[in-house]
Amino acid sequence: MLPADICWAVRPSSTAAYTTRLVVYRPSDPANFNGTVVVEWLDASGGADVSADWIKVHIELIRNGFAWVGVSAQAVGVEGPIVGTNASGPIGGSKAIDPARYASLDHPGDSYSYDIFSQAGLAVRHRNGPDPLAGLQTRRVIAVGYPQSADRIATHVNSMQPLAHIFDGFLVHSRSLAAGNLSDGPQPVAVPNPWFLLAADAKNLESAATHSAIGIAR
């Protein structure tokens, strides 16, 4: 993992074609749109895309005229296998859950995830191709992610944003001590000093409730 609070010198590497998924909620009446688009890096830590922040704040976003775009930025959310089931059905990557609907999706790997997320931000700000917002006039674009996705957003803030300036603001929601890796390749490890990871009480309570819900003994 990379240190979370340093601006890094980055450069382009290889290129790859991709097709991913955007999930969009927007006001049906343009008069109700407040001009702000929230772009969420969908959390794929459980083997499937989860709109963690949308779940927590969607009532507020709808009530106040925001648009929300969920981005399948990571490979496992697109290409991953079925990892379980719940009341709604199977859990896993989009192509495994619904092969017919998502047959055209193609993710080249997480080394490209930051650029995929950046291009999703550009798609809602400067719409030169298909328009995910159906003509709504965007004034602000905010990137959000929770919690594994927050690590990725932290990396985006420190590496991509200084170069591309795509987003107007960021919500880095409950990240870990470090930031997300920049590529799929081997990562340097350097921990010269002892360190502590402090989680707020609310996070601990949330974790306990989750473990209880899925039957993990504590």
Where are these regions (language model features)?
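C-terminal His-loop and adjacent cap/lid subdomain of alpha/beta-hydrolase
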Residues: 1-218
